[in-house]
């Protein structure tokens, strides 16, 4: 279990001896630099030093803008090359899934906490038995001892629908160069895939069991798979499904 090794006015430090993934990635250190910067730092032996860095900026009551970076320092060239081949917008889709893991839960939870009296009531309101809860408890201690409250006196807005909480287009895609460009290209590719599919169907019909029939079937299969994949990518750039990855069966 992670433990808090230092708490002060400027934040706190934590250390997790086992580390994530049951120790496969090595020990992890954590730093919360008050009031809004936090990072995890670990070195996976034989692979890389991995950091998860998040800067949270409150923009209105109950809503923050997150600036996240995931720096790697690889110990060999091969992993760096392989990760570099993955388009940035695909990485962003994966990042959305991580952020949305708690999205609905936290949206409800902050309203429960507000009704109970806010951060001073966190210890009485929440049961926090998990490894990650030590960070949450330490953050509330810092807030109650040293932190101010942005938008003091304002009430939380009405609870949003799950569909709105899962939005990715308004919150990210339209403002991200990589994701917005990918979305335009995906939408432009769909008519071409349909054209190939219809052309393949014509080949199957005209081939009369000859070689062109086989070509038509192959082209139809490829076009169908392409349409299926671009639909998945488009959805991934537009909205999440609300299914937390940690709750899915292995």
Residues covered by each model-derived region:
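C-terminal catalytic domain of Rieske-type non-heme iron oxygenases
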Residues: 1-250
């Amino acid at each position: 279990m992670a433990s808090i090794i230092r708490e002060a006015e400027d934040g706190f430090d934590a250390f997790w001896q086992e580390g994530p993934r049951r120790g496969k990635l090595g020990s992890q250190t954590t730093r919360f630099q008050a009031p809004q910067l936090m990072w995890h730092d670990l070195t996976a032996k034989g692979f890389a030093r991995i950091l998860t860095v998040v800067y949270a900026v409150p923009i209105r009551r109950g809503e923050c803008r997150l600036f996240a970076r995931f720096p790697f320092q690889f110990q060999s060239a091969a992993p760096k090359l392989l990760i570099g081949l993955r388009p940035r917008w695909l990485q962003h889709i994966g990042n959305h899934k991580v952020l949305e893991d708690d999205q609905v839960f936290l949206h409800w939870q902050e309203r429960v906490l507000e009704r109970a009296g806010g951060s001073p009531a966190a210890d009485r309101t929440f049961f926090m038995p998990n490894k990650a809860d030590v960070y949450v408890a330490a953050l509330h201690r810092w807030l109650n001892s040293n932190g101010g409250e942005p938008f003091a006196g304002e009430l939380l807005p009405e609870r949003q629908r799950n569909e709105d909480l899962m939005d990715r287009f308004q919150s990210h895609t339209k403002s991200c160069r990589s994701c917005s460009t990918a979305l335009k290209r995906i939408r432009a590719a769909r008519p071409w895939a349909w054209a190939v599919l219809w052309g393949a169907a014509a080949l199957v019909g005209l081939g009369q069991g000859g070689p062109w029939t086989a070509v038509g079937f192959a082209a139809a299969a490829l076009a169908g798979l392409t349409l299926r994949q671009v639909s998945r990518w488009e959805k991934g750039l537009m909205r999440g499904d609300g299914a937390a990855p940690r709750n899915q069966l292995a």
